[in-house]
Amino acid sequence: MAGEAEALATTAPLAPVTSQRKVRNDLEETLPKPYMARALAAPDTEHPNGTEGHDSKGMSVMQQHVAFFDQNDDGIVYPWETYKGFRDLGFNPISSIFWTLLINLAFSYVTLPSWVPSPLLPVYIDNIHKAKHGSDSSTYDTEGRYVPVNLENIFSKYALTVKDKLSFKEVWNVTEGNRMAIDPFGWLSNKVEWILLYILAKDEDGFLSKEAVRGCFDGSLFEQIAKERANSRKQD
């Protein structure tokens, strides 16, 4: 019969990968119930109540992630709104068109309220949980809630150079480590999403911080960057 130490072990001697990709066992010291999926907020060990001042507007965390691109707050993100969002984030026109086509083509149909495709490629925020794909970090659950422990595990497993920060190589390792068998759409989507986030939010030393990743999950990162850019333009 296994003792308490073995029952709570997070590494297995015959599975070296469990030692290479460590998970934390101290999260409850600073984050209540880190295993419990949160519907409205995206907390971590430094922000146990989520993003201060960020209004969920009653949306799930996954819906909040997308809502930045909904320019007129009608619950639908059309390609021209996605394009405007990317421009507000600082992407040039060509890359904004590219990312817009990729995102709306990939996620429009699965979020539609009917089986009939729409040539306008709208993404319906109400149904964004249906756009969850495989080979991701599982920080969103299948209903669009946010699971704090899985955010923390990303960084305990892969942030080996600087605590709570990912280099580009480590971002790549995240996408490789999350790969599931026979899931090419998930492999590609996961890599595109993480590389896009790295391009958007890496710091001057080339690292992607846990705070930036957390802000991406609840959309507050997008709001912050767009606001900073708008203020900068006013000062010019």
UniProtKB/Swiss-Prot annotation:
Heme binds at H65. Keywords: Acetylation, Calcium, Chloroplast, Endoplasmic reticulum, Heme, Iron, Lipid droplet, Membrane, Metal-binding, Microsome, Oxidoreductase, Phosphoprotein, Plastid. Ca(2+) binds at D70, N72, D74, E81. It comes from the Eukaryota. GO terms for molecular function: calcium ion binding; plant seed peroxygenase activity. Induction: Up-regulated by drought, abscisic acid, osmotic stress, salicylic acid, wounding and pathogens, but very low induction by jasmonic acid. One of its GO terms (biological process) is defense response to fungus. The modification N-acetylalanine is found at A2. The keyword Calcium applies. Coiled coil: none annotated. Its EC number is 1.11.2.3. Homodimer. PANTHER family: PEROXYGENASE 3-RELATED (PTHR31495:SF48). Transmembrane regions are predicted by sequence analysis tools, but these regions probably constitute hydrophobic domains associated to phospholipids. Belongs to the caleosin family. This is Probable peroxygenase 3. It comes from Arabidopsis thaliana (Mouse-ear cress). The gene is PXG3.
